[in-house]
Structures are given as C-alpha cells and as structure tokens.
C-alpha cells in the first residue's frame, strides 16, 4: 500500500501519493502558472476549491519556498522530509536539463543548502539520491572548497591552455579516491604531461574521462602529443562509463579497456601514429565491453605500411549486444580485420571514412552490414563531393544513418572511389534498390574540380544505381552530368539509369550547351518509349512538397527564357517545371 499524507496550505487540503506522484490530480485546467501559485498560497481558498496537481507542481512549490521562507501561514516546516526530498530531486533534475552552462547543473544544490539548516540536513542525508558533486576548474581553490563541504565526489574540468591555476587541477587530481569525472580539453604540453603524471594511480570512482590535446597548428598532423603511459589510472578503470580521447596517443589503451566492463560510450579519435594499436588487440577488449552503446574509432592519418601486414582471422567471435552507433576513420584493411569477428545486432547507425586506396576491397564490411538485423533496402541515396572527400549516404538503410566516405582530394580519385564503393563496398541489395539519387557538392568544392574526369568514369560510377527513377543534380553538377547524359544518348541510352523517369535540376538558367546535352538525352529516351520529365529543383524548398505535389507547367516543350529547357526540336513533349 502506498504511503499517503495530508498537509495544510492556507486552508487548501491536498492529498499526495508519495510513491506514485504521477497519480496526483488537479481539478483545474489549464494548469496555473507559478505566479498564480504564489498568489493562491498567500490567501485562503474555499473548501470546494480542491486542486490536485501534476507532478511538476512540486517544483512550483519549491520555487515559491525558495522565494521566501514563509508566505502567509505557509512555511517549509509543513512539508515532511520525504516531500522535500522529492522536490529537491525534481528541482535538480530540471536544473540539469535547463542549464546553459555545464557547472550550473552540477552546483544547483548550493541554492538548496543555503535556505535553512533543515534543508541543508535533508540534502546532505541523501548525497547519492541527489547526485551531489563538487565542481573544480583551474580557478577553484581546492583546499578551501574541500574544507567547507562534506566528502562528495569530485568533477574536474579544464578547458583551454591557461597556465594559471594548473596547481588547482593537479591538487584536485590528487584526491583520486573521490574523482568521478575528469575533462581536460585543449590542453597543451607540458601541462598535459604534468596532469598525466598525476593520473598514474588508481581512480576507483571515475565514471567519465575526456582528454583532448590541442596542438599549435590544427591544420597539420602533429606527433608531439605526450604519450599516455601503460600505468595510466593504475592500469584499471572498473567504473568507467564514458571515455573520450582526442588526438591523444595511448598505445596501451586496449589493456586498460579490459577492466572497463561498464563502458557505455567510447570515443577514440584522431589517433596519431604513436598511439597505434592493432585491430586484434581492439577486438580482445571489445569482447569484454558488453554494455557498449557508442563506439568511435578514428586515426589521424593513414597507418604506415609497418602496421599493414596480412593478418589471420580472429579466432573468437565478438558480440556487442547493445552497440547502436559505430563510426570509423582509417585504413580499409584495419577495418576489415576489426569487423571480421564482430556482430552488432542492435546497430542502427554506421559511418565509415576510409583513406584513399587505388583498390578498395572490403568483403568483411559487406558481411558485417549484411548480418546487421536493422539493415534494409533504402529508397534514396546522397552522393556528396567536397574538396577533401566523396561520400555516399543511404538514409533509409538503417534507422539512423549509413555513410561511407573516401578521403581524397583529386577529382579523378573521388570518381574512381565512388565507382568502387557503390559496386563492392555495400551489400548487393542496397545500392540497386535506390529510387531517388541526389548528386551534390559542398561549398568548398574547387571550380576546376572536374577538369580531369572522363564521361566513361562518370558512367562507371553511376552504373550501380539501376533502380533510380528520380535524379537530383545540384547547381554545380548540372553541367558536369549533362555531357555524360549526352554521351548516353549517342550510344546506349538505357545503359545507365534504365529506370529513370524524372530529372530535377537545381540550376534554372542553363547554357545552350547544357540544354542541348540534356535535351538530346531526353529525346533519345523518348524514342525508346522511356520518356523523361525535366523539373526545376529548388533544394531549399524541397521539404515543403511531397513528390506528388510538385507543380508542373503543362505539357508544352517550348517555354519562355525562364524555362529549364526551351529547345522544342530536342524536347519533343517533355514537361518542364517552372520556378
């Protein structure tokens, strides 16, 4: 039976179910604002004005009590400790969700303990329930702070490369038995070296750890970051749940992870050569991380040939039963060795970034994706070219995201890579199922990007998309793809895009050469009884329309100067969409 109690507030009796606060009712709609509660609590109400409050009224009451210790005949003393604790808990939860700055949510309990001695006692009797913690930065006087508060868990946060106050961080780290969270962000040498030296002892209470090293020139690969020694954290992290290393070399990381069996989030990014560890060592530690939900593993640059020897398959299967998000950046050979023994039955987001290779051979990646239960045939695909890479995203293949990106600059390399990944790096049932294909670029694409690309290379890259009905071309790619379509018209018009029905062009005012090229392709498809309709595509307004709602201007093939195509001798009866 749930425990109930009754307490009096200015003549208004409320009955609250402590063990089921969601069952509290209010016979008044809409819910009064906190300002209204302030007025109500200051005067008597008729007995028939029974008001039963939803859960967050507790927060409103607490806010009123924080405004003043007494309001009329209402004081904090009328509330039992259990009710105060419920309100404190909810108040701190709301503070955590609404705080704009990280320390504010950690230190919200300071407000409560300064109201009165009774509130202070209630708060400090339940430090675990209220998740009380002390927050230290380089500007926090550690000794004075520790002297005035109970022995609560410690959070250490250092952001930036300020030289002042480093002694405070080091002094806080020396309380290793109480430190529950450490974030050292954008810290340069030798300050990071000094902090790492202090962290060689065990931190038994540590649940979150983030270290990001900041070099002097972020555009250049730098191998001067201090190497984390094998004795880091005493070689054990039994309570660690969140680990984030960015640009920090730690070759002994897999050994530490063997003890971190409660790990939920693992982010290891921008690994320099000095921090390399083998895929086999990574598989060994991953096999113990059965609670892992998010895994990021990324290398700063291609792995030297020294580490690219052929490897035997890992003898033990590794199942990550809770993993939902995997992101990788590195060599394709490394990923192949890593994924071969791994299964992730709940995976719903997969992002892969490869450094360029002439031949990209990824059979293990194909098998890994194929045995992922959440995988399904996508409806659309996005091919995006940038100054540094080409990527293919299949939004509907997984509940989250499926992305494969090749990191390279020359446009010819990008086209060759696109052809390879679309034909061999995805399971065979994915790319051929795509019905809507978007080809676009980013703002940093160089103007001379396509100078060395032949039409045959474009045809090879687009050939796997056999089911595409709708082709969307961004402004920059309209002229680039147009000549390829023109070549199709002169040879085998259905060799590529045999199912194509609609072309959406973001560029509205086409040059005569581009109009002729697209027009020849449209006319050639008309001759084989596979008509193509050309539309203007406003990518900014795309979300405002469903496919069936896109406006089309009649069947006239000859429009004014604002039309996408205006050559009646080429277009025949194809429809054109106006702006």
Regions found by a protein language model. Give the residues of each.
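Leucine-rich repeat
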Residues: 1-579
